[in-house]
Amino acid sequence: LALMKMSKIPPLRWLSTIYIEIIRGTPMLLQLYFFYFGLPMLIPALTKQKFLCIAIALICNSAAYVSEVIRSGIQAVDPGQKEAALSLGFSESKAMWFVVVPQAVKNILPALGNEFIMIVKDTSLGSTFFIGDLMTQYLVVKGPTYLPIEPLVIVGIIYFLMTFILSKVFGHFERKMQRADRHSGYERKRKQQREVQI
C-alpha cells in the first residue's frame, strides 16, 4: 500500500488513497461489524469462521496505518541516497529495496512497534462478537462466579505483559540499530582521519 501510494501510476495511487482514507475515516467497531457480517455473505465458506473474519478486519485496519508509517519512513530518507544508487547502475526497484527501505526501517521502527501494540489491544473489541478473545473469556468467567473485578485484573495483566514484551522487543532492535549507526559513523570518521594524515 505504501509503495502503491508513492507509485507514478495514477490508478495505483488512487486505489491506495481511497482504501487508506476509508479505513482511517471510519471507526474500528464499524469495520469489525462490516467484516463479521459482510465477509460470510461474499465468501460462504467463512460463515462459521467468525474468528477469522475478525482477524481479517484487524489486519485490514492495521494495514492502512502501517502503510502510512512506512511511507513517511521512506520519504524521510535523504533523496540523495536513491540518486546515488541509481547513478551506480541500480534499477529503480533495486535502489528502493536495497538502499532506501533498509534505511527507512530505522525511521519507522518505533511507530511500527506502537502499531503492533495497538493491534494487540484492539483484539479486545472482539468480545462484542464472542469470538473467544481475552475479554470474551472474562465475560464467561464473570457470569457464573459473580466476580467482576478479579477476572478483569487478570485479563489486564495478560494484556499488559503482551504489550510490554512487544515494546521491549522493538526497543531492543531500535537500540541495536542505533549502535550500528554510531559504529559505522565512528568508522567513517576514523577513515577520514587516516586519509587526512596520508
Model-derived features with residue positions:
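Transmembrane alpha-helices and adjacent helix-loop boundaries
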Residues: 1-198
